[in-house]
From Swiss-Prot:
Keyword list, A-Z: Cytoplasm
GO biological process: primary piRNA processing
Subunit structure: Component of the trimeric PUCH (precursor of 21U RNA 5'-end cleavage holoenzyme) complex; consisting of tofu-1, tofu-2 and either slfl-3 or slfl-4; which is required for processing of piRNA precursors. Within the complex, interacts (via N-terminus) with tofu-2 (via N-terminus); the interaction stabilizes tofu-2 and may form a functional nuclease. Within the complex, required for the interaction of tofu-2 (via N-terminus) with slfl-3 (via N-terminus).
Function: Component of the trimeric PUCH (precursor of 21U RNA 5'-end cleavage holoenzyme) complex, that acts as an endoribonuclease processing the 5'-end of precursor Piwi-interacting RNAs (piRNAs). The PUCH complex consists of tofu-1, tofu-2 and either slfl-3 or slfl-4, with tofu-2 exhibiting endoribonuclease activity. PUCH-mediated processing strictly requires a 7-methyl-G cap (m7 G-cap) and an uracil at position three (U3). PUCH also exhibits a strict bias for piRNA precursors with an A or G at position 1.
Domain notes: In mammalian Schlafen proteins, two SLFN-folds come together to form the nuclease domain. In tofu-1 and tofu-2, only one SLFN-like fold can be identified, suggesting that the two proteins may interact via their SLFN-like folds to form a functional nuclease.
Protein's name according to its UniProt entry: Schlafen-like protein 1
Residues making up the signal peptide according to the UniProt record: none
Length: 373
C-alpha cells in the first residue's frame, strides 16, 4: 500500500522539478517598482504642500489643509459651512477664490449693483378715473411689480406729472361731456336712433349721440404755431391768391387750333340741362380735341356775365359732377383731371361771373351716352 501511494503521489519530488525562482524575482521587482512610485508620490505631495504653504502666505481669503486619501476640508473666512471636496476642486477653488487678476471695470453693471431701491408706480396715479375698458388679460401683482421696476430704473426718462395729465385726458368718458359745454366746432354723430314699442308706441330707447371736440390745449398749441412768426401786411397779401377778372362789355376773340369754343348767353344757361353738357364733353373726348364752354357772352361776343349767388354756384357744380359721373359708357376715370369749372368775376358787378367749363384732357377712348342709345 505504501508503494501504491508513493507511485500515485502527484506531489512527490520528480526529476523534472520546475524552477519558480524566475517568477519570484519578477514579483519582487514589481514590488520594488511600486515602492519607488510611492516614494515619488510622497515627494510630489511634499512639493504640493510646500507650494500650498507659499500660497497661504500670499492668499488670505481662505485656508486649505490637505488631509490623506485625496480629500480636503475647505474652511472659509466668511462663516460658511465646511464642505468636503476633491483635491482638484480644492486647488481650483483656492486659485479662483483669491484676488481677481484684472481690476474691475468702472461703470460696468452699476445699474444692477445699485443699492437704491427703485420706486414702484402706483396704478392709481395713472388712472384716476376708471374708464371701464379692459386693456387685456389680468396679470399677477408680482408681474406688474417687475414690469414697473424695469420701467422705473431710469426715473428721469419721463415726467410723471405730464403722464398723469395725459392718462387722465384719454380716459374721459363720452357721457361726461355735456351738450352745453360743447364748442361750436364740435361734430355730432348719431349712433342709433329712437326705438319704440311696435304695439303701444312707447319709447323704449332714447336716441344716442356721440360728440367729438377739440381739446383747448390742442387749440392753444395751434394758435401759438400760427402766430410764431409775425408777418407784415404786404407779405400776407403776396401769399393770397390772385383772381383773374374780366371787364363788362369786353369783347373776347378766339384763336385756338386744337380747342373747340362753345359760347352760351346768360339766358341759355337757365334752360340748359345736364344732357347738353354731357354731349359737349362726349364730342370733345371722341374727337380728341379740347373744349371750352363760356356762359355769359352775348351774340355780339361781348361779356355780359351771369348773375349767380353762392347757392346757385353750388347747384351748377353739382350738375356738372352729375353729368360727368353718369350716363358715360365706359365711365370716365379721374374726373378732376378731365373737367373743371371756374367762375371769373366781372368787374364792378356784384355776384356776376363769366362761367368757364373746360375739357382739358384727351383720352384714347370712345365714349357713348347710355340715354342716347
Amino acid at each position: 500500500m505504501a508503494a501504491l501511494f508513493e507511485e500515485n503521489d502527484s506531489y512527490s519530488d520528480s526529476e523534472n522539478e520546475e524552477d519558480f525562482s524566475g517568477f519570484l524575482s519578477e514579483i519582487e521587482e514589481n514590488e520594488n517598482e511600486d515602492e519607488f512610485e510611492n516614494d515619488d508620490e510622497f515627494e510630489d505631495d511634499d512639493e504640493l504642500e510646500n507650494v500650498d504653504e507659499l500660497e497661504d502666505d500670499e492668499l488670505s481669503s481662505e485656508e486649505v489643509d490637505i488631509p490623506s486619501e485625496n480629500e480636503v476640508i475647505v474652511e472659509l473666512h466668511d462663516g460658511q459651512a465646511e464642505v468636503e471636496e476633491s483635491l482638484l476642486d480644492a486647488l481650483l477653488g483656492k486659485a479662483l477664490a483669491g484676488d481677481q487678476m484684472n481690476s474691475r471695470i468702472e461703470g460696468l453693471f452699476e445699474d444692477l449693483d445699485s443699492s437704491v431701491e427703485p420706486d414702484i408706480i402706483d396704478r392709481s396715479e395713472l388712472e384716476d378715473v376708471d374708464s371701464g375698458i379692459s386693456v387685456g388679460a389680468v396679470s399677477s401683482s408680482s408681474a406688474e411689480t417687475q414690469a414697473s421696476d424695469a420701467k422705473c430704473k431710469n426715473k428721469d426718462a419721463f415726467d410723471m406729472s405730464s403722464l398723469k395729465k395725459y392718462m387722465q385726458y384719454i380716459t374721459e368718458e363720452e357721457h361726461a361731456v355735456s351738450v352745453e359745454d360743447i364748442p361750436d366746432f364740435a361734430s355730432k354723430k348719431n349712433v342709433y336712433g329712437t326705438s319704440f314699442n311696435v304695439r303701444n308706441g312707447i319709447m323704449s330707447r332714447p336716441p344716442r349721440f356721440e360728440f367729438a371736440r377739440h381739446d383747448q390745449r390742442w387749440i392753444d398749441s395751434c394758435v401759438s404755431m400760427a402766430y410764431e412768426k409775425d408777418k407784415t401786411l404786404k407779405e400776407l397779401i403776396t401769399l393770397g391768391k390772385l383772381t383773374t377778372t374780366v371787364k363788362a362789355g369786353a369783347k373776347i376773340e378766339f384763336r385756338t387750333k386744337f380747342t373747340d369754343v362753345h359760347i352760351r348767353s346768360a339766358d341759355e344757361i337757365n334752360l340748359m340741362e345736364t344732357h347738353d353738357i354731357q354731349q359737349i364733353i362726349r364730342d370733345a373726348l371722341n374727337s380728341k380735341r379740347l373744349a371750352v364752354v363760356l356762359f355769359g357772352i352775348g351774340k355780339d361776343g361781348k361779356v355780359t356775365g351771369c348773375h349767380m349767388g353762392p347757392g346757385q354756384q353750388d347747384n351748377l357744380r353739382l350738375a356738372l359732377d352729375t353729368a360727368v359721373q353718369t350716363e358715360f359708357a365706359p365711365p370716365i376715370e379721374n374726373i378732376l383731371d378731365v373737367v373743371d369749372m371756374n367762375f371769373v368775376p366781372v368787374e364792378e358787378m356784384d355776384e356776376t361771373f363769366l362761367i368757364v367749363i373746360r375739357v382739358k384732357q384727351l383720352r384714347n377712348q370712345v365714349y357713348r351716352l347710355e340715354s342716347s342709345v
